Amino acid sequence: MNEVIKTMLDHRTTRSFVKGKELPKEHLEQIIASSKQGPSWMNGQHYSIIVTTGETKQQIADLIRDKAPGNAAHIENSAAFLLYCLDYTNIKLAFDIEGGEFDISNQHEPILIGTLDVGIAMQNAALAAESLGYGIVYCGGVRGFGDKISELLNIPENALFLCGLSIGVKDEELSTEKVKPRLPDAANVGYNEFPKSNVEVLKEYRQTMVDFAEERETKTWTKKFADFYAQPSGIEKVTKELLEKNGFVSEKER
C-alpha cells in the first residue's frame, strides 16, 4: 500500500488541537496549492478559499460560540480555518470581459457544479494537510451563521460559503477519535448497476456503529438520520436566505 492510500484510509476527524500553533508558511502554501490543483468542471474553478488565522479566526469562533461551542473550540484552537465558498464572481467578471448579462438565478446546474468543485478542492486540502501530519475537521455547521460570517469576511453577491476546514496540530492527549467504520460496499457500491442496499445491510451497519461506541453519539446511525431528514435542518432558513440574497435562486424559484 502506498503512502497516499495509507493516509486516506487512516483518516480520522480531529477536534482537539494544540492551541497557539501556527502552520509554517510553506505548509500552508502546499495545502492551498494542492487544494487548487484538484479537477473542476470545465476548469471553471467555481470556488474561493478564505484562509483565516489569528484575530479573524478568533472572531469566527466568538460569533458561533453560544450556539455551537464544539465548533467554536476547534476553530479557535486550530492553526488555520479555511472557509470554502461556492463562487461565481470570476464567472461574472468573464461576462464583463466578453459582454452579456450574468444571471444564473433561473438555473439549477450552477449550484451543483460549484458544490462539486468545492468538495473536490476541500478534500485535496484535507488530504494534503493529513499527509503533512496535521489533524483536520470539516465544519458545515458554520452555514448556520452565514449572514454574520458573510458580513465579517465581505463575501459578495454570486458567492456563498459552504463549509469550513479546521487544520491544526493534533492534541494526542485529548483526541479520542478513531478511524470510523464506513458503510459496507453492499450499501453504496455497485458494479455495472446501482447498489442494492436493503434494511438488513443497514441494520448490520447500525450495530457496527453501536459496537464502535463513539462517545459523542447519542443515537444509532439509522435513528440519527431518520430524525435529521424528517424535517428541515436548523440552518435551512439561513441557507435559503443566502441563496436568494446572493443570486443563486430567482424570484420564480422562491
Tell what function each PLM region has.
Residues 1-254:
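Acidic, surface-exposed loops and disordered segments
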